[in-house]
UniProtKB/Swiss-Prot annotation:
Cellular component aspect of the GO annotation: cytoplasm; ribonucleoprotein complex; ribosome
The organism's taxonomic lineage, starting at the top: Bacteria, Bacillati, Chloroflexota, Dehalococcoidia, Dehalococcoidales
GO molecular function term, any single one: rRNA binding
Function: This protein binds to 23S rRNA in the presence of protein L20.
Name of the gene: rplU
Name of the protein this chain belongs to: Large ribosomal subunit protein bL21
Any one Gene Ontology BP term: translation
Pfam families named among the record's database cross-references: Ribosomal_L21p (PF00829)
Annotated InterPro entries: bL21-like, bL21-like_sf, Ribosomal_bL21
Stretches for region Disordered: 112-132
Length: 132
């Protein structure tokens, strides 16, 4: 397709997100004002268009910069408790708060791919003719 496919997989709030520059992402609430910038340094995987770097557990030196676009509430989640034969039930609801981030730049920080291992030497079974 014509463009360079740069993306990173980051971790925020115990969840993983695949992000690209310019993308809007809803993550768990950050205590930041709208317009503030944040650096997300838990980069689990990085694809810069040429090489793919997988961290163990994170890619050293890699960062993703983002700005806070706003705060929103998620859909309402209902919890219903019910006990049979006792007319006992209770319905409660909850709306999770999210922060909307605009992904700015994916910085590799000089993250380089590990050098490939050398192939093992092939074992050869030598047959001796003297019977030993």
């Amino acid at each position: 397709m014509g463009g360079v496919n740069i993306y990173a997989i980051i971790e925020s709030g115990g969840k993983q997100y695949k992000v690209t520059p310019g993308q809007l992402v809803e993550v768990d609430l950050f205590d930041l004002a709208e317009g503030d910038s944040i650096e997300l340094d838990k980069v689990l995987m990085l694809n810069d268009g040429e090489t793919v770097t997988i961290g163990s557990p994170t890619v050293p030196g890699a960062k993703v910069t983002a700005t806070v676009a706003g705060h929103i509430k998620g859909d309402k989640v209902f919890a219903y408790r019910f006990k049979a034969k006792s007319r006992n039930h209770k319905k409660t609801g909850h709306r999770q708060l999210y922060t909307v981030l605009t992904i700015g730049e994916i910085l590799t920080g000089g993250a380089a791919e590990k050098p490939a291992r050398k192939p093992r030497a092939k074992k050869t079974n030598e047959v001796t003719t003297d019977g030993a």
